[in-house]
Amino acid sequence: MRNLSARSLLDINSLDEHQRYLSLMKISLCSALVGSLAMWSMMSQAAAQAAPQTPPTTAPAPVVRQPMPVPWPIQMGLRSFQVEARIPVVDKVVLVPDTATYLDEISRWTLRGRWPILIEDDLFTPMFVRAFKPSKVIRRASVGAMPASVDEQQALAKYAITQAWTVPGSEARPTNPAEAFASARFEPLGIVFASMSDPAWTAGVALAAGHGQVLSWLDGPFDPPSSTMNPQQFEKLSAQIEDAARATGLRYAALGDSIDAVTICRSMPIKVEVPQSAQWAPPAGTNPKPGEPVAVTDALCRLSDGTRWAIASTIFGDQIRSAYIAMSSLYLMPRSVWMLNTYQTDGDWGRYAMTEGGAMLKQQEFETTEFSGVQASAVSWLNMLMGGFKADVLLMNTMGNSDFFNMWQNIQCYPEDVAMLQHPMALHLIHSWSLTSPESRDTVGGRWLEHGVYAYAGSVFEPFLAAFVPPSLVAQRVANLVPFLVASRWSEGPFDATWRVTLIGDPLMVIPPPSMPPQPRLAPSSLESAKGETDVKENARAALVAAKTTGAPAEYATALLDLVMTGDDAMAAQLWSIAVAKGDAVAVACAPSALGPLFRQRQSDAFLAAYRLIPAPTLLDQDMLWQLWTQQLASIKDRAVLDWFGQQVRTVRPAVDLSRLAPEIKRVAGTDAARVLVTAWLEKTTNAEARKHIRELLLGLQ
């Protein structure tokens, strides 16, 4: 197995605490490898026993036991984890205002220490900080604009990766990433494709620098993710990917060699109508109709006979979200796993039960919660939405389409019911069509991504149940250091052929079991600071002192926002109470930043008061409103408050909110009042499908 050489990294980690950690981790990894091989052997034996048996015609030959080779998925996870374990993490998060400063900060990573870097925003930044829990959150001043030319931009990106892999104290002075990897005696684990003309390059550069991967440019026009690539475009893309792998000079043609991961960090179609050939033949017996698509990430990285040579995934989105996806993958240590099963337990559905996988995760000290039966009902789901999900990982079985998902007993929920998240979350979703239009918030998958899912295995079309890896098997693989997205893909059997499950995120992201020793973090003071750094918590204190002196609403708003950025929701909620006491001007200035903390703290009345002060709530604000209050509408007795909720109905599918609000208006003000509300929405709704559902609701209001 190729890894970081002892001389290149162990010698430069001079801190005793990190040396002790590495010694403990070596023992833990050996133990984990033994367990992983045993688990893999058991799965292989179970598969063999399930196959039809032919009676032997001759006496069996003596069995000569050979050492079991390490399966490539476990090799892949161990290689990724070794990089993670050997390079210390600094206990801080750095917030930057723009992409030029982002690249400059990545160039400050070294083999002595790295840290998360986020392009500051008010959704993904505090979400990441709440999960990472750094001792300091630092804000950097801008270093200026990016250079105008693409060549200069590419040079800056490659420089950042080179710096991150230059061995401190070495006489080597690498001028590019390949030379830096060579000087560190390190063999890259994969290839990242990006374009400086596409904003997702922020993920590409971070993943190349963080994992130690080759960065290759993939320019040219591509249609958006919801579209379908034609066969000619796909053949060209497939050839480009393989040519780039070949150009590295590393072995790539089989899983388990050097290059096993391909991450495409740019916007492109997620579906493809593949050419008719053995290279992209669908699973036997599936018989797709002409024009029906498969997943681009499942079709890529295959030899002419259809054999897979790497696991491909994609990352798309703006610069902020793409950086967040990369940093979540590189630095977070998921601990809590929710396993939610809406399926019945007999027949083929029983294979997708989660109890066995949950038991495996608990053995590895994951905080595991299983939901099934009435706990997986629509009512239970809507109750769980209040305040946002706290899970780090969600394994979920459901049925439906791109615009709805069925809970227990086939009660429908909708994209509007996709949970807000307290922490970044990885998702394995068994559900047809969830990612057919992944950039649209009006689909199940699109809403999950918008809300902060950073790793996602899901389907782009109707894949059939057997196309999904059962959650218990995913859990067993993940617990044995198989990367999360790799664990979500079949690597043998009929559904290892080109089909309809796609992967979004970092294919090298592993989830080390909590039973392993935690990696100690370096103090922020252990490395030199950059120019223009300020401590966000200290900024909040200074703004609060200024606010008490001047009474300026803007100072209160600055203090509250900075508290949110440090992940301190409880303190932010307290400051909101102070803002309200200071009068309307201060409350109005603070309200937009207060919504998130009040939602997550489940302070329903305070949230409602803040929401009503915001002239133009965002779509995410609306999601928080309805997720916090849907199950509390029955407690409202004031007709005026219910009428106000009638004005807040989300416009794409009005029947979703109306179906939950109208019965409460009927309860308080009578059937006619409820019908007036629903009729008013029918009159101002133009979408035919939405109007159909409103009419159905109106017919039921008798």
Where are these regions (language model features)?
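A structural feature that tracks compact, well-ordered secondary-structure segments
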Residues: V93-G113, E120, I191-H211
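Signal peptide processing junction and immediate N-terminal pro/mature segment
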Residues: W40-T54
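Cysteine-dependent hydrolase recognition
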Residues: T125-K136, A145-A585, G596, R600-Q601, ...
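Inward-facing hydrophobic residues that define packing positions of alpha-helical scaffold repeats
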Residues: W576-S577, A610-Y611, F645-G646, V678
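N-terminal low-complexity, Pro/Thr/Ser-rich intrinsically disordered segments
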Residues: P52-D91, A160-P174
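Bacterial N-terminal signal peptides
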Residues: S28-M42
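N-terminal secretory signal peptides that target proteins for export/translocation
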Residues: M1-K26
